[in-house]
């Protein structure tokens, strides 16, 4: 079963009518993943023992539908590695809240997708389990850190997948792979069972080829959770109710900082075309400014690395994961961490440890926290007079494998247009705008809204999807 032309609704219809059984769907999905993954390496683990839930109720849209999970989200009894050597053999004994909710909705968890190690990266090249390839061009990166989930959806291995987004890790790979991806409001979806990178920024979200499929999945995974104190108890609306609407009268802000000369010409043209589409259909377009955008990258890397250095202290080679051979306890700690973590993870641990040190805390971490407040205030001000903010997801389309992995500054700057949404805790998504005329690769259109206003994000994304029908295009890298 290849899902390039399938949706959750179409699968639900086939299962309900008996055109395909849930058991056969699982078998066909696994067979297709094995075949396709020889090219793209989207999965770290495929659950070959996966079985659909018993007594399926097809009033549940996800009943019997195979879903992929990013490998930093805990799955009970199914290996969860965070794409790291230090967790290469970790098999959890409990379930993350989002996976428990998917199973309660009778979805089938089909496997765990590749990612940058501990979600630290923008290309899925830091994985201990090898690079993932972009289905549109196998010589290009799929983006990161949720590159495996994005490639799995774009290649038709699954109809939807969960990802996580700390600074753009759902939206950038969604953009690079020509699919939809949404990072909900911080606190909209439980992080219980998400392997922490930066706890004040991390958020689980959804990736799918079609906007409605992500809305269906978010309907299931969103909402309160007693085990996560940061989750909001606000009522979760039916996100599909925001689909099928026009954009007449919608107030759309376009930050001038997001349309600078740093944006590739091919990206700019596709984004501008979507803005003009909104204008032509009655949206009110307002040019605005996010004046602290120039500070977001250093601010983010100080805060995120500081939180990461604390979160990753728990990996010591004693309780679980990789343990190096050593002569004494001190050597176990030292060798297990130095051998178990990759270079990028160690780089961020060192940066974070320095920023939190007594001599640097006030100068770096405290200052970054203050700038974060200013970034949040920039967004609050714009949302006083606007419903959504739009622009590019990335300044460029998918770049060549191995072309930026050794240039940390260039790699870190890949997040310059996505980080702010995490800083402000607002919902943000990428929807395909088209193909760049200069590179022939997909371009993502970013949509942001105020906190807990995912509805406007879905409304605009769905309108663009219905207008350009990008989902009808097939990734060129899959052609034999």
Swiss-Prot record:
Its EC number is 6.3.5.7. Belongs to the amidase family. GatA subfamily. The gene is gatA. It comes from Lactobacillus delbrueckii subsp. bulgaricus (strain ATCC 11842 / DSM 20081 / BCRC 10696 / JCM 1002 / NBRC 13953 / NCIMB 11778 / NCTC 12712 / WDCM 00102 / Lb 14). This is Glutamyl-tRNA(Gln) amidotransferase subunit A. The keyword Nucleotide-binding applies. One of its GO terms (cellular component) is glutamyl-tRNA(Gln) amidotransferase complex. It catalyses: L-glutamyl-tRNA(Gln) + L-glutamine + ATP + H2O = L-glutaminyl-tRNA(Gln) + L-glutamate + ADP + phosphate + H(+). Pfam families: Amidase. One of its GO terms (molecular function) is glutaminyl-tRNA synthase (glutamine-hydrolyzing) activity. Heterotrimer of A, B and C subunits. GO terms for biological process: translation. The active site is at residues 70, 145, 169. It is an enzyme of class 6 (ligase). Allows the formation of correctly charged Gln-tRNA(Gln) through the transamidation of misacylated Glu-tRNA(Gln) in organisms which lack glutaminyl-tRNA synthetase. The reaction takes place in the presence of glutamine and ATP through an activated gamma-phospho-Glu-tRNA(Gln). The keyword ATP-binding applies. Keywords: ATP-binding, Ligase, Nucleotide-binding, Protein biosynthesis.
